[in-house]
Design a protein with these regions (language model features):
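AAA+ P-loop NTPase catalytic core and its hallmark functional loops
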Residues: 1-150
């Protein structure tokens, strides 16, 4: 099941507000800047200072952030694909949410649903967005983990 997102937790811009130099942030010999955020929040992964970046994979992930493109990383189970994305996001202060695409995730979790809510003392039906629309609206990197799972 996908965890319900606290929609009120929004004390930062929804769009990147700084440019980071890849050479300085990742110690890679490239003249490239990547958009990021000046502030962290609860959805920004924690930085692992001991993490070792693979240059080609890192540049692919950074290109995705820079050009707002999807990036697919594939490899054997347990080789650190999702962690690599999270560690890049952590250094850019990008929100990053990992969604395990196992049998417990439904279309409703991903897209959203109509829900009965109380507003101003009146019961109404209101659309509650799932993880995909929420992420699109809130500047969040989504990692679909185990997309090929049964």
């Amino acid at each position: 099941m996908v965890q319900i997102i606290n929609k009120e937790s929004n004390d930062r811009s929804k769009k990147p507000d700084v440019e980071y130099k890849v050479r300085e942030l990742f110690d890679l010999d490239v003249a490239m800047t990547v958009p990021g955020f000046s502030k962290k929040d609860e959805y920004v992964p924690i930085i692992d200072d001991s993490y070792i970046f693979d240059k080609e994979t890192t540049l692919s992930i950074l290109a995705g952030f820079k050009y707002n493109r999807r990036v697919m990383i594939q490899g054997y189970h347990g080789t650190g694909k999702s962690t690599h994305i999270e560690q890049v996001a952590a250094r850019l202060n990008w929100r990053c949410i990992r969604v395990n695409l196992d049998s417990h995730v439904s279309r409703i979790d991903l897209i959203g649903k109509d829900a009965i809510v109380i507003e101003k003392g009146v019961q109404i039906t209101k659309f509650k967005e799932g993880i995909i629309p929420w992420s699109l609206l809130n500047g969040t990197a989504l990692v679909f983990d185990e997309y090929d799972a049964g």
